[in-house]
Each structure stands twice: as structure tokens, then as C-alpha cells.
Amino acid sequence: MITNTELEYKGNLYPNQIISFNQDVDKFNFTSENGVILQITVLRNSALRFRYATENVFEPDFSYAISEDASRGYGDLEVSEEESYYLITTTKLKVLVDKLTMRIQISDHEGNIINEDEIGFHWEENYEYGGNTVKMSKITQNAESYFGMGDKATHSN
């Protein structure tokens, strides 16, 4: 009997082509061929929540950022499917979800880009501690600054 105990290190993993889409009122779920699920929840006309799962299932729902008591609601909410993307539209925002890469672009109705994925969501399996190391790469817009939390070895922007 031959037993192979070596782990296969896969490096960075990325969502691939979206194969299914469904909508449940204000929640939009996009599932890729390799089991990544993107869930977009419309909280308000100008506030969205993005969740990702990497193995066809979400962890229990929890967020420090969203209060249970926060007011919710939106005016118009529409979704359309184009050849290469899905488009979710509220009265204030447009969210484009690329069908091939699951990358996101958020803009206002005048076409000003507010937030845009560069590489977007990706992850790496953590064999030492279990689970995944989640990564996100965004395009920085003109005059935009980024200030992250936690320890810094250099300037915080």
C-alpha cells in the first residue's frame, strides 16, 4: 500500500465563471464553477453588503459592521443580465458583476466609479491553521486614500 501524506499547495485561488444566479428579494447569489458564492445584499439605496463563500456554503452569518437595529430599505431595485455581466441597480448605485471573473464594479448613475476590483476576491488554503486566508485587491481611484486597521510597519495610507 502506498500512502501519500504530502499536501498539495495550490497558492492563490480565484473564482471562475458564474454558472448560476438567483435572487431572494434583496439578496443576490452568484455561484461559480469552482464553488465560490458571492452574495450581495441591498441594505439601503446606497449601502450594500458583499459576502463570499469558497466551498458552496456560507459560514454562520455575523458582522460587526451591520447593526441589527439599523434602518433598512430602498426605493427601486432592478437586476438585468447582459452577455458578459449582471447589473444590479438601486436609485443611487449600479453594481456590475463580471460573469467570467466575479469581479465587481460599483458606480453612481453618472458613471463615476466608486469602487472597483483589480484582482478582486481570492483566497489561499491555510494548511497550518486550517481554513482560508482571504484576500481582496481593489483599484485605487484618483484622490482616494486607504487606511487599514491593525499594526503597520510603515505609513498607514
Label the predicted regions.
Residues 1-157:
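N-terminal accessory segment at the very beginning of proteins
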